[in-house]
């Protein structure tokens, strides 16, 4: 195999590779011989088809298989000999394909991973925020539980519905005068002044009496989950059937038993544990973000542009989707596209650099992702698709890249845990509200 370097600029590398025909001919002949053993042609006994006929009929398909195999093998050997760690899948351009008596020639372009010097992190100082679960938080959650178990009693008085009342209605939603899917329902209890499933829906029923009919106009939010209705103005034909009042049950052991618990104390314990879990997740997001901010200041190496481009394209696809349905936050919505792209390219570069630095720290510290951890991640992914778990596992078994997509976040979190353990961490108690205001890490 002959290798000629054609580019060596920054992280970019390019080579021209020539594989002599003599190296390929033996493999090609062996492959055709294997084919000859299995094919059946009229007039010939199995395994006795002339080599010239086998070559005539199957030569092109064998050449195509051998071409891919030879290019992959030669590229792998090239990277090993040149000690290249490619940042992304290399670009291959075949100059001269496999033909009788001709060498295989192809070009390889790739970016290499940068040489990363892990900075000294021994003096790293971090603050770990935490919050305690208050009785007020537990009581509020219990009130929510009671509201979900409330009953509705009919109001016999003939009067208009007022705020706080519940109106039992039938409705038919129409888009451009035609009923739309999912827009029709009967015997729905609507709390007047409460949160309707569309802004303005419940409010316009105030003042209706049992037996009254009304047409109301509402506009679906731009980010409504049904794309065919997002941002659309529709009407609802409302028929009020009865006026009711909501009666919340007493918050006691009886309520606990009706929803499957032993007593009220058990519910309080579960609510407390769930809140503690949420606070711990928020606390980790904050300390992780602070850690990444500190690491980001020490990433003085060049990021492969191909990796930055790939990361940016993923981010920008989400941004465009959010913009399409009106989910962009106020700050981003006020920026022009050029500024917005520059901001998110900076984020993409930060993510790539931090990812490479964390991976290098993990490599040097020999931090590994175990088979059990990968299996756990696959099981967690499979639980998202009830009834299709086997299909999910088959997908992972056939797609190594998808498995690597699970491995990356696990390794990242293990490296983050290692670095937090290494740092000088100060614990600080804050309120749950202060903890909830903390934005997540960018990586």
Curated annotation (Swiss-Prot):
EC numbers, comma separated: 5.2.1.8
Enzyme class: isomerase
Superkingdom of origin: Bacteria
Compartments in which it is found: Cytoplasm
Keyword Magnesium listed: no
Gene Ontology process terms (BP): 'de novo' cotranslational protein folding; cell division; chaperone-mediated protein folding; protein transport; protein unfolding
Similarity annotation: Belongs to the FKBP-type PPIase family. Tig subfamily.
Entry's free-text remark on domains: Consists of 3 domains; the N-terminus binds the ribosome, the middle domain has PPIase activity, while the C-terminus has intrinsic chaperone activity on its own.
Protein name: Trigger factor
Organism: Gluconobacter oxydans (strain 621H)
The gene coding this protein: tig
């Amino acid at each position: 195999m002959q290798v000629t370097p054609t580019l060596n600029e920054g992280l970019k590398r390019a080579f021209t590779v020539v594989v002599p025909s003599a190296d390929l001919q033996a493999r090609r002949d062996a492959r055709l011989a294997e084919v000859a053993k299995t094919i059946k042609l009229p007039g010939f006994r199995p395994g006795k088809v002339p080599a010239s006929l086998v070559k005539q009929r199957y030569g092109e398909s064998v050449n195509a298989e051998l071409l891919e195999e030879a290019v992959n093998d030669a590229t792998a050997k090239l990277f090993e000999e040149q000690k290249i760690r490619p940042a992304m899948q290399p670009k291959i351009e075949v100059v001269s394909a496999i033909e009788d008596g001709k060498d295989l020639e192809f070009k390889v372009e790739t970016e290499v991973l940068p040489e990363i010097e892990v900075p000294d992190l021994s003096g790293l100082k971090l603050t770990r925020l935490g919050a305690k679960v208050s009785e007020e938080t537990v009581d509020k959650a219990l009130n929510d539980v009671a509201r979900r178990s409330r009953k509705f009693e009919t109001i016999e008085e003939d009067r208009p519905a007022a705020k706080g009342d519940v109106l039992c209605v039938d409705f038919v939603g129409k888009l451009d005068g035609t009923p739309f899917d999912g827009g029709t329902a009967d015997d729905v209890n609507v709390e007047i002044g409460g949160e309707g499933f569309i802004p303005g829906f419940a409010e316009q029923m105030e003042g209706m009496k049992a037996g009254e009919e009304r047409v109301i106009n509402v506009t679906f939010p731009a980010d409504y989950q049904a794309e065919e209705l997002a941002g659309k103005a529709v009407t609802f034909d409302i028929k009020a059937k009865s006026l009711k009042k909501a009666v919340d049950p007493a918050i006691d052991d009886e309520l606990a038993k009706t929803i499957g618990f032993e007593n009220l104390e058990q519910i309080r314990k579960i609510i407390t544990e769930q809140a503690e879990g949420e606070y711990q997740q928020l606390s980790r997001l904050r300390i992780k973000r602070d850690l990444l901010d500190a690491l980001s200041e020490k990433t003085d190496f060049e990021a492969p542009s191909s990796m930055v481009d790939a990361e940016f394209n993923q981010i920008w696809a989400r941004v465009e989707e959010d913009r399409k349905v009106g989910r962009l936050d106020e700050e981003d919505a006020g920026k022009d596209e050029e500024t917005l792209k520059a901001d998110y390219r900076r984020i993409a570069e930060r993510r790539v650099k931090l990812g490479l630095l964390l991976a290098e720290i993990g490599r040097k510290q020999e931090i590994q992702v175990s088979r059990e951890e990968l299996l756990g991640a696959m099981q967690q992914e499979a639980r998202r698709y009830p009834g299709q778990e086997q299909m999910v596992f088959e997908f992972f078994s056939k797609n190594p890249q998808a498995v690597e997509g699970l491995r990356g976040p696990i390794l990242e979190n293990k490296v983050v845990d290692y670095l937090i353990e290494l740092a000088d961490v100060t614990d600080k108690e804050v309120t749950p509200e202060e903890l909830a205001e903390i934005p997540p890490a960018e990586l």
